[in-house]
Each structure stands twice: as structure tokens, then as C-alpha cells.
Design a protein with these regions (language model features):
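N-terminal leader/linker segments that precede catalytic domains of diphosphate-processing enzymes
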Residues: 1-84, 89-120
Length: 120
């Protein structure tokens, strides 16, 4: 079976409408996760988790919908060398996590925020 995505404008409207409705939240995650993961739900972080945001950028090229990824730098840390969506940590001047995602996307892949239509 081949799954074909609708054109980008139509897909954008579908995503926006879906984001306006109730999302399945934790219950959907619980249905899909392995039993072994449930043991970790009550663990506490040593420090408060850092707020961060990513941008799932969709664009059309040669009739196909695409999304860019980045490869993180190699360093001594848990995210070293990972393939990831553009994004990063919240900074107070961002004011919102959407602004964080837009700022980080511009820093990491050079797409200016005025070139992005935020769906949600």
C-alpha cells in the first residue's frame, strides 16, 4: 500500500484543524509504550528539566513534502551526534516556546521566522 500525502496547503489545514481539537495526550502514549517504561514514570529529575522547543518544518520540493533535520555536534553529552529537528533551549527573551523554535531554526538552518507559517 502506498500512502500519499495531500498537497502542502491542504496538509497544513488538516494539521491546524487537528491541533484545535483535543489531543490524545498521555493516554495514547500509555497504550503504545513497553511495560518496562512504566517503571520510569515515577522517577524524579535531579534538576528541573530545561524547557525547549523544536520546529517541524514542512516544505514542498519536486511535488514531495519534506522536512529538514540537523546532525548535532560531537561532544561529551547525551545528545552528541544525534539526528534531530532544529530547536533548542528556551531563553527569557523568547517569551514563548514558539519563538524559541523559530529562533533556533534560524540559528541552526538559516530559515528566518518571517518565512515560516506557524500552524500550532
Amino acid at each position: 500500500m502506498i500512502f500519499r500525502l495531500p498537497p502542502l496547503e491542504q496538509l497544513s489545514k488538516l494539521i491546524q484543524n487537528r491541533l484545535l481539537s483535543n489531543l490524545p495526550g498521555p493516554q495514547a502514549h500509555l497504550r503504545m509504550e513497553p511495560e518496562t517504561r512504566k517503571a520510569f514514570l515515577n522517577l524524579k529529575h535531579a534538576e528541573a528539566p530545561r524547557q525547549s522547543a523544536v520546529l517541524i518544518l514542512l516544505f514542498e520540493k519536486n511535488g514531495k513534502i519534506k522536512t529538514p533535520f540537523i546532525r548535532r555536534n560531537i561532544y561529551d553529552g547525551v545528545h552528541s551526534g544525534q539526528i534531530a529537528l532544529p530547536g533548542g533551549g528556551f531563553e527569557t527573551h523568547d517569551n514563548t516556546l514558539i519563538n524559541t523554535a523559530l529562533r533556533e531554526t534560524e540559528e541552526e538552518i538559516g530559515i528566518a521566522k518571517n518565512q515560516v507559517k506557524v500552524l500550532g
